[in-house]
Amino acid sequence: NGTCAWLRPDGKTQVTVEYQNDHGAMVPIRVHTILISTQHDETVTNDEIAADLKEHVIKPVVPENYLDEKTIFHLNPSGRFVIGGPHGDAGLTGRKIIIDTYGGWGAHGGGAFSGKDPTKVDRSGAYIVRQAAKSIVASGLARRCIVQVSYAIGVPEPLSVFVDTYGTGKIPDREILKIVKETFDFRPGMISINLDLKRGGNGRFLKTAAYGHFGREDPDFTWEVVKPLKWEKA
């Protein structure tokens, strides 16, 4: 947004977080390490880069209570980073499917999103299970959850739908699965309709090319909208 005029487009961030396993739910305790490598112009010093990154990037993003005197900061640890992008590297990777989703914390089926319209379950299937899992947690059915779905080409109904709450469910997983199947339609055509994925054409997905597909507050990210799930609380 122009706050750091020396910033350039290329870069990478990585945050290492320590968690505590609380009966299946993973609770963040502290940030162990923050790595930021960012391209910059020729006028700025490494000390200025480090100071700006702490003030304008880390401070607004990482809650203060997760940082302590033992938190390690690697800010442009390789030194000068003036030349970036395809000018600086040959053989760049394709779209990073793990960064697009859950950063290695959640499971991934292996299919990339980029270049695919909502008729491809690599994209739409990932979106509907995101909404389902998020709704399970938001409804108080579990503190942690994964929803898995599998398909065969040319077969509208999914081959399988699977729910695992890692022992955090308030009711058995099989009962949660029943609620999920009653609430969500996992057929690709119905996913597009129910999540309104064709609104605005495929250009709508340009926003997903950076900053990930999940955890975003944007009206176009319809899969982030929680659906209320009805269940009998003990």
UniProtKB/Swiss-Prot annotation:
Catalysed transformations (reactions): L-methionine + ATP + H2O = S-adenosyl-L-methionine + phosphate + diphosphate
Binding site for L-methionine: D89, K120
Quaternary structure, from the entry: Homotetramer.
Phylogenetic lineage: Eukaryota, Viridiplantae, Streptophyta, Embryophyta, Tracheophyta
Entry EC no(s): 2.5.1.6
Entry-linked InterPro entries: ADOMET_SYNTHASE_CS, S-AdoMet_synt_C, S-AdoMet_synt_central, S-AdoMet_synthetase, S-AdoMet_synthetase_sfam
Disulfide bonds: none
Pfam families membership: S-AdoMet_synt_C, S-AdoMet_synt_M
Species name: Petroselinum crispum
Subcellular compartments: Cytoplasm
Protein name: S-adenosylmethionine synthase 1
